[in-house]
UniProtKB/Swiss-Prot annotation:
One of its GO terms (cellular component) is nucleoplasm. This is Transcription factor HES-7. A motif (WRPW motif) lies at residues 221-224. Its main location: nucleus. It comes from Mus musculus (Mouse). Has a particular type of basic domain which includes a helix-interrupting proline. Induction: By Notch-signaling.
């Protein structure tokens, strides 16, 4: 039993080593395939269309592409927003073009009319898009256009004035210390305040009903004294 267990333990690493090696090769192949597609989108080199391209050639293309990019754009130099926008637009067009090429390989079975309609609609997305308007903060009120005085809405409102009330002045507004002092200075005596202050309120009973003020008895005409 002990000899059998030792034999299985010795065969374990031998069985795992080929599996690990296979996984490592699969990872390398996947990364190289992705690198080939990325270089094809950026460089548009027809040699990169071959899916069976040698691994060494893919790596040489990658080194040449990085060397060219570092020569055009030195490291450490900040990029402007315009350059970033151009790079994004170029990336978008390259990827879209690659998708169209892949779609064309599957569109041969469709009818010519359907294929033409599909590609004409897809090619519309390759046109440059107009710049977007500036974003407006939804929390801020929308700007109002300036009003023209000659407009039919604003013109009559400017020329028409509200009617001025010609009634007697309010007692509170008519009486003021300066007004009383000016009147007293003109006549030499203090001006009476009759008519300038509001009349006192009528007396109220305890039950809440107002008490009528006492009036003198009515005068009757008599022929005798």
């Amino acid at each position: 039993m002990v000899t059998r267990e030792r034999a299985e333990n010795r065969d374990g690493p031998k069985m795992l080593k080929p599996l690990v090696e296979k996984r490592r090769r699969d990872r390398i192949n996947r990364s190289l395939e992705e690198l080939r597609l990325l270089l094809l989108e950026r460089t548009r080199d027809q040699n990169l269309r071959n899916p069976k391209l040698e691994k060494a050639e893919i790596l040489e293309f990658a080194v040449g592409y990085l060397r060219e990019r570092s020569r055009v754009e030195p490291p450490g130099v900040p990029r402007s927003p315009g350059q970033d926008a151009e790079a994004l637009a170029s990336c978008y067009l390259s990827g879209f073009r690659e998708c169209l090429l892949r779609l064309a390989a599957f569109a041969h079975d469709a009818s010519p009319a359907a294929r033409s309609q599909l590609f004409s609609a897809l090619h519309g997305y390759r046109r440059p898009k107009p710049p977007r308007p500036e974003a407006v903060d939804p929390g801020l009120p929308a700007p109002r256009p300036p009003l023209d005085p000659a407009s039919p809405i604003l013109g009559p409102a400017l020329h028409q004035r509200p009617p001025v009330h010609q009634g007697p002045p309010s007692p509170r507004l008519a009486w003021s210390p300066s007004h009383c002092s000016s009147r007293a200075g003109d006549s030499g005596a203090p001006a009476p305040l009759t008519g300038l202050l509001p009349p006192p309120p009528p007396p109220y009973r305890q039950d809440g009903a107002p008490k009528a003020p006492s009036l003198p008895p009515p005068a009757f005409w008599r022929p005798w004294p």
